[in-house]
Curated annotation (Swiss-Prot):
Part of the ABC transporter complex CcmAB involved in the biogenesis of c-type cytochromes; once thought to export heme, this seems not to be the case, but its exact role is uncertain. Responsible for energy coupling to the transport system. The keyword Acetylation does not apply. It catalyses: heme b(in) + ATP + H2O = heme b(out) + ADP + phosphate + H(+). One of its GO terms (biological process) is cytochrome complex assembly. Residues 7-209 form the ABC transporter domain. Disulfide bonds: none annotated. This is Cytochrome c biogenesis ATP-binding export protein CcmA. One of its GO terms (molecular function) is ABC-type heme transporter activity. Pfam families: ABC_tran. The keyword Cell inner membrane applies.
Length: 212
């Protein structure tokens, strides 16, 4: 179980170019929350996740982790965060096995090869473990990146379209993992164009905060 945490969004507004996407977004995400960020294309879902991950600053407002602005505790905050964006982030020159082994080494997960074999099976890459990532499809590279979820000890997961290029069985496996993470006291925030098969899922629709 994780310690109790809270991610607070305080009066957030977001601008892209000359256009304000949303404004006055205030809400809290608490330990145990599994939330899908919704809204039409272009409303700022990815921009919001990047703000929450500390990659960009909001036009107005601030994000707080356990009551302190993330801008004042960047190192500590990022130790508590796993962010997976649109780009896979895998090292193309390394094999699938070597990429997962690298993730294992930089995480606080148990270091053993049995876990890696199990992980390769979970992400559907058994038989392709010795291929350089550069020779794999975009979907297979995405699966390597998703392997980090099973190795992560971070309580806060921020995931931009994690189901892209994933089949139905893979979506079910990932959703079960997200449910489990939330039940352990973690926080899962994601975007998805697909239906998320979870009875625990909450939804936040950015249309309610669309700038006039």
């Amino acid at each position: 179980m994780f310690e109790q945490h809270k991610l607070s969004l305080q009066n957030l507004s977001c601008q892209r170019g000359e256009r304000v996407l949303f404004r006055a977004l205030t809400c809290d995400f608490n330990s145990g929350d599994f939330v899908q960020i919704e809204g039409h294309n272009g409303i700022g879902k990815t921009s919001l996740l990047r703000i929450l991950a500390g990659l960009v600053r909001p036009l107005e407002g601030e994000v707080r982790w356990d009551s302190e602005a993330i801008s004042k505790q960047r190192e500590q905050y990022h130790q508590n965060l796993l962010y997976l964006g649109h780009l896979s982030g895998v090292k193309p020159e390394l094999t699938a096995w070597e990429n997962l082994q690298f993730y294992q080494r930089i995480s606080q997960a148990e270091q053993n090869t049995d876990m890696l074999w199990d992980l390769l099976e979970k992400v559907g890459l058994l038989g392709r473990e010795d291929l350089p990532a550069a020779q794999l499809s975009a979907g297979q590279q995405k699966r390597i990146a998703l392997g980090r979820l099973w190795l992560s000890q971070a309580p806060l997961w921020i995931l931009d379209e994690p189901f892209t290029a994933i089949d139905k069985k893979g979506v079910e496996i990932l959703t079960a993992l997200f449910d489990e993470h939330a039940q352990r006291g973690g926080i899962v925030l994601l975007t998805s164009h697909q239906e998320v098969p979870s009875s625990h899922l909450q939804k936040l629709n950015l249309a309610a905060y669309k700038a006039e």
